[in-house]
């Protein structure tokens, strides 16, 4: 939820689509893991994580090396009790994962440019694919996912009230309370 996490809805949806094959991948179907979240990530603890800490799903996966070559490995992925837990854990990870003393995805929360947001995710080490940024941007553009991004509030969320120290009678208080 963009309003809760500050992560663009278009970016989260594009990752969901890419990482889970529109929710139809083996990992999404058998483990409710729609974002390719491995069991071992950044120390495994961050505020709001939604994984139970021990349920895993092992499967072969492809990793791309920096030279562009591919290698097949067997990896343990997080297994969730629901897709909702997968979505919540993904957001919590992007907001709270650390790389030493720095946030791994610093600047992602509140970023309003999807191209910059997906670059932050790639630069933080989320995926090994050299084409990850281009693939996410293509999905966002192909499906016009930016239409789901919440508009940034342009009006203050607090209201100011003029308060009198002394009220002569109840009638003079009319309109002072909501």
What does each of the following model-derived ranges do?
Residues 157-178:
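Beta-loop motif signature
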Residues 1-156:
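Catalytic cores of secreted/periplasmic lytic hydrolases that degrade extracellular macromolecules
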